[in-house]
A protein has these predicted regions:
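Short, ordered coil/turn segments that flank beta-strands lining enzyme active or ligand-binding pockets
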Residues: 71, 106, 203
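Conserved segment of the thioredoxin-like fold in thiol-based oxidoreductases
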Residues: 135-182
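Thiol/disulfide oxidoreductase modules built on the thioredoxin-like
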Residues: 118, 167-175, 182-232
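Extracytoplasmic
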Residues: 61-63, 108, 116-118, 148
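Sequence contexts marking disulfide-bonded cysteines in secreted/extracellular proteins
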Residues: 79-106, 110-117, 134
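Conserved redox-active cysteine motifs that mediate thiol-disulfide chemistry
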Residues: 117, 125-142
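N-terminal targeting signals for export/organelle localization
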Residues: 1-97, 233-239
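Hydrophobic beta-strand anchors of alpha/beta hydrolase catalytic cores
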Residues: 122-123, 153, 198
Length: 239
């Protein structure tokens, strides 16, 4: 906005100088804002769908089924995201040739999410391009050590090389399960846009909540505790 250039306000200064200083200030602020956007972009990935899975009220929505290669075994192939109920499910199925549903695959070294539905479940989608993602996986590991008898945990790396992921597993001494989403198809299905993205689910693979971004140990543990409590309450009321 311009402020009446050419009018004397009694200050004795040439009014034509003030718009120039305002313009310079606006330019500096604008450049700082662009820098912030660029920094934020480091912790995001591009997906074809807007919004994180469950960010709005999804109701009793089942998690999309998937099977991923185990990062520790070096199993080949991409994530399998074929569903077993394509005709009736609210979750989209991949186009193209018919594939074996993810939870029916029998491939050595594959991690099937359906095998984790016997307990509450926490998924972590992460990638090395995110500034805090590696540290957040350390938080995820500590939660795994604390809650693994009550809750299942699975981390899914998005589009990093197998060797890089295995190197990080060894360096950080992670013992929680880690799967690979080599081509990003799974992260797109789950509408992952930030790093890390945590997905929380009730037993049976029913969506409960998501959280995006950095969490302290206390914050993350509180969310897992809340999932456990909500799962018990749900089990007592849902038949």
């Amino acid at each position: 906005m311009e402020n009446g250039a050419g009018r004397d306000d009694g200050s004795g200064k040439d009014p034509s100088e003030r718009p120039r200083r305002t313009t310079i200030y606006s330019l500096i602020v604008g450049m700082a804002f662009i820098a912030l956007i660029a920094i934020a972009g480091i912790n995001t990935i591009s997906t074809q769908n807007k919004g994180v899975l469950g960010a709005s009220n999804e109701g009793d929505m089942p998690l999309a089924q998937f099977a991923v290669p185990n990062a520790r075994t070096g199993a080949g192939g991409d994530a399998n995201i074929a569903q077993d109920d394509c005709d009736s499910a609210r979750i989209p199925c991949p186009s193209g040739n018919q594939r074996t549903p993810a939870c029916r695959v029998d491939v050595p070294g594959a991690i099937r999410v359906c095998d984790l539905f016997d307990k509450p479940l926490v998924l972590s989608f992460w990638f090395t391009r995110g500034g805090d993602c590696e540290n957040q996986e350390d938080v995820f590991q500590r939660a795994y050590r604390r809650f693994s008898r009550q809750v299942n945990f699975l981390a899914v790396d998005v589009r990093d090389s197998d060797s890089e992921v295995r190197k990080l597993i060894a360096e950080h001494h992670w013992t929680h399960p880690v799967g690979l989403d080599r081509d990003g198809a799974l992260s797109n299905l789950y509408r992952v846009g930030g790093c890390p993205t945590f997905v929380y689910a009730y037993p049976g693979g029913i969506f409960q909540a998501t959280s995006i971004g950095k969490l302290s140990d206390q914050q993350f543990f509180s969310k897992v505790d809340a999932l456990i409590a909500a799962s018990k309450q749900r089990a007592a009321t849902v038949r």
